[in-house]
């Protein structure tokens, strides 16, 4: 095609796009048409650039990389909207703003969203040190088998999340990351829809989950984590991975809550102070609160530590005897790609294995290959599970290792 033909084609496509703007249709088919026209327009621009043209009429052409990106973006939007049009939500109102690429990429990414509202976080409980976040009344997402679901955006002390169809919580924003920068004390309060959520008041007694919210009658939030039984060397079966599903403030603010006293405790492991506290009978008192574990004791525990009633130092020592792991099962290529992407999350785990598989075991191809991720403690693993998205189509289970 010569420059005149390309110019005519570009003008015709732009005219159709402008007509869609003027119509402002709320029908999903109109949005599919809009992105199809954008795809054709940027493919035309790409071809014209490849032919050496810098303008089509009075229209300057974008760089090749820009046209390629925009065309691929339009293809992606078209595919997602076509899939959505075959779901039960196709009859809802879908405007240009609801189906924009920018909105698709805002947290939570790769989901459609409607009716945003503001969540204000007061760092240090100071109204003058406030940061606004956007949450959504409705979030439309695809599950592992590409079925569409609609859910509500929710808020707790830790951040913004939505609950998936299987009951799992998917956090798409954690306040702790900004608190590292803007907060002096490591505390904040959350204000939204005439509700206030604050941290539990520190006391010597165990804090209830109800302390997370100041609204009377508000139910506490829990992070639903997958659990599966693991068998120990002695033949005992424990339910590893069953935990309270809301990460406590001490878990989320792990790096900030190390006080001077705790630092002194950590630095004096050679002669630790024996600090007696009330521990449930099923947990060995000496190993939970006593001296640091020896090399032979590492990995020797087969029971979970209590969630409260022991110091931070005692918890670290106790968990050293039972390093937690995450076993992921799936296709080899998916696991290898995911392992490569994990390089930016190295601070959230201790080490990981290469992709491997068991020999002489007949298992489905979808779960034949394995990958192990090892953590320093269960708190680190909980944070990892909230921040890192597991590869699609893979399954996982929790467990422990006696040694590495």
Swiss-Prot record:
Sequence similarity: Belongs to the papillomaviridae E2 protein family.
Any Pfam family: PPV_E2_C
Region annotation DNA-binding domain: where it falls in the sequence: 322-404
Region (Transactivation domain): 1-204
Disordered, as annotated region: 201-306
Function: Plays a role in the initiation of viral DNA replication. A dimer of E2 interacts with a dimer of E1 in order to improve specificity of E1 DNA binding activity. Once the complex recognizes and binds DNA at specific sites, the E2 dimer is removed from DNA. E2 also regulates viral transcription through binding to the E2RE response element (5'-ACCNNNNNNGGT-3') present in multiple copies in the regulatory regions of the viral genome. Activates or represses transcription depending on E2RE's position with regards to proximal promoter elements including the TATA-box.
Stretches with biased composition (Basic and acidic residues): 259-285
Keywords: Activator, DNA replication, DNA-binding, Early protein, Host nucleus, Isopeptide bond, Phosphoprotein, Repressor, Transcription, Transcription regulation, Ubl conjugation
Protein's cellular compartments: Host nucleus
Listed InterPro entries: E2/EBNA1_C_sf, Nucleotide-bd_a/b_plait_sf, Papillomavirus_E2_C, PPV_E2_N, Reg_prot_E2, Regulatory_protein_E2_N, Regulatory_protein_E2_N_1, Regulatory_protein_E2_N_2
Gene, per the UniProt record: E2
Modifications the protein undergoes after translation, according to the UniProt entry: Phosphorylated. Sumoylation plays a regulatory role in E2 transcriptional activity.
Cross-link (Glycyl lysine isopeptide (Lys-Gly) (interchain with G-Cter in SUMO)): 329
Keyword flag Secreted: no
GO terms for MF: DNA binding; DNA-binding transcription factor activity; nucleotide binding
Any one GO CC term of the record: host cell nucleus
Bias-annotated ranges (Polar residues): 224-250
GO BP, sorted A to Z: DNA replication; DNA-templated transcription; regulation of DNA replication; viral DNA genome replication
Complex formation: Binds DNA as homodimer. Interacts with protein E1; this interaction greatly increases E1 DNA-binding activity. Interacts with protein L1; this interaction enhances E2-dependent replication and transcription activation. Interacts with protein L2; this interaction inhibits E2 transcriptional activity but not DNA replication function E2. Interacts with protein E7; this interaction inhibits E7 oncogenic activity. Interacts with host TAF1; this interaction modulates E2-dependent transcriptional regulation. Interacts with host BRD4; this interaction mediates E2 transcriptional activation function.
Protein name per Swiss-Prot or TrEMBL: Regulatory protein E2
């Amino acid at each position: 095609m010569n420059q005149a033909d390309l110019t005519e084609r570009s003008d015709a496509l732009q005219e159709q796009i402008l007509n869609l703007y003027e119509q402002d249709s709320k029908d999903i088919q109109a949005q599919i048409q809009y992105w199809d026209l954008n795809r054709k327009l940027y493919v035309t621009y790409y071809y014209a650039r490849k032919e050496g043209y810098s303008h089509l009429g009075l229209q300057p052409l974008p760089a090749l990389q820009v046209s390629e990106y925009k065309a691929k973006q339009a293809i992606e939007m078209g595919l997602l909207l076509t899939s959505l049009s075959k779901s039960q939500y196709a009859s809802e109102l879908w405007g240009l703003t609801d189906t924009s690429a920018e909105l698709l990429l805002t947290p939570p990414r790769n989901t459609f969203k409607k009716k945003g509202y503001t969540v204000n976080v007061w760092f240090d409980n100071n109204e003058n040190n406030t940061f606004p976040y956007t949450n959504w009344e409705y979030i439309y997402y695809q599950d592992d088998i590409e079925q569409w679901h609609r859910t509500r955006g929710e808020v707790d002390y830790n951040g913004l999340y939505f609950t998936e169809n299987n009951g799992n919580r998917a956090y798409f924003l954690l306040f702790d990351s900004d608190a590292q920068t803007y907060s002096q004390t490591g505390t904040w309060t959350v204000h939204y829809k005439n509700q206030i959520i604050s941290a539990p008041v520190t006391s010597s007694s165990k804090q209830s989950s109800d302390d997370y919210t100041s609204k009377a009658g508000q139910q506490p939030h829990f992070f639903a984590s997958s659990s599966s039984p693991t068998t120990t060397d002695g033949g005992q079966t424990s339910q590893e991975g069953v935990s309270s599903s809301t990460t406590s403030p001490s878990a989320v603010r792990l790096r900030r809550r190390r006080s001077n006293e705790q630092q002194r405790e950590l630095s004096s492991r050679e002669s630790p102070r024996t600090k007696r506290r009330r521990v449930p009978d099923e947990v060995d008192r000496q190993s939970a609160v006593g001296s640091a574990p020896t090399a032979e004791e590492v990995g020797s525990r087969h029971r979970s530590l209590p969630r409260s009633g022991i110091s931070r130092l005692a918890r670290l020592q106790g968990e050293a005897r039972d390093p937690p792991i995450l076993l992921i099962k799936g296709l080899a290529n998916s696991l290898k790609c995911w392992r490569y992407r994990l390089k930016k999350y190295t601070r959230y785990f201790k080490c990981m294995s290469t992709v491997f598989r068991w020999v002489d075991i007949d298992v489905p191809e979808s779960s034949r290959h394995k990958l192990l991720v090892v953590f320093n403690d269960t708190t680190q693993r909980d944070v990892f599970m909230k921040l890192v998205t597991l590869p699609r189509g893979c399954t996982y289970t929790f467990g422990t290792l006696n040694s590495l």
